[in-house]
Curated annotation (Swiss-Prot):
GO cellular component, one term: cytosol
Name listed for the protein in its UniProt record: Triosephosphate isomerase
Positions bearing Phosphoserine: 80, 106, 159, 198, 212, 223
GO BP, sorted A to Z: gluconeogenesis; glyceraldehyde-3-phosphate biosynthetic process; glycerol catabolic process; glycolytic process; methylglyoxal biosynthetic process
Quaternary structure note: Homodimer.
Modified residues (N6-acetyllysine): 14, 156, 194, 238
Keywords: Acetylation, Cytoplasm, Gluconeogenesis, Glycolysis, Isomerase, Isopeptide bond, Lyase, Methylation, Nitration, Phosphoprotein, Ubl conjugation
Amino acid sequence: MAPSRKFFVGGNWKMNGRKKCLGELICTLNAAKLPADTEVVCAPPSAYIDFARQKLDPKIAVAAQNCYKVTNGAFTGEISPGMIKDLGAEWVVLGHSERRHVFGESDELIGQKVAHALAEGLGVIACIGEKLDEREAGITEKVVFEQTKVIADNVKDWSKVVLAYEPVWAIGTGKTATPQQAQEVHEKLRGWLKCNVSDEVAQSTRIIYGGSVTGATCKELASQPDVDGFLVGGASLKPEFVDIINAKQ
């Protein structure tokens, strides 16, 4: 990892937790020794964004797990970047595979959300990744490059973007891409950014890995030159999240 790219660890709590157990998790995180050279972000369910922001140590940022593409309006059930910022959160996760595949979000919609979130001043954790049948068909690059292009077309300032590569076949399945598989895709993504955006953006943009990251798998993954951190699912609700945050130490 280039010295200019600060290691980034996001915890995606998904639709999990209640005040009591999330409060206990937050106490664990607040009491833990976290490295100063690692950026840590937690993404609680939207109902708990305010709770998390009030309880978490200020050095841990808060993200929403989703947002809509406009500021206000008759969009029942949606939240806007402005609302997310109003609660003190600084980031939003967009394009997560569960949004794509469970809720049917298209590349086009994700691109529109990315553009609006950035315009409103949020940082964006933009997710891309192939499904198992796509990997087995040998089209991993085609899929992730197409997804990345739609994101890139909607980004003016890359300093507020973290790219999260999550092979869909490794999310919540217990299967993890090998460190070599992760590095190979991350390296190709950086190459795509160099060719299609700029060398400066390619060198400075953090590309993080998501997909069944655990305390046991994180150190070797973190040692790969193009893996700049993690987007952690289930393990971010457990004390081992602290070990993952410390993967570079």
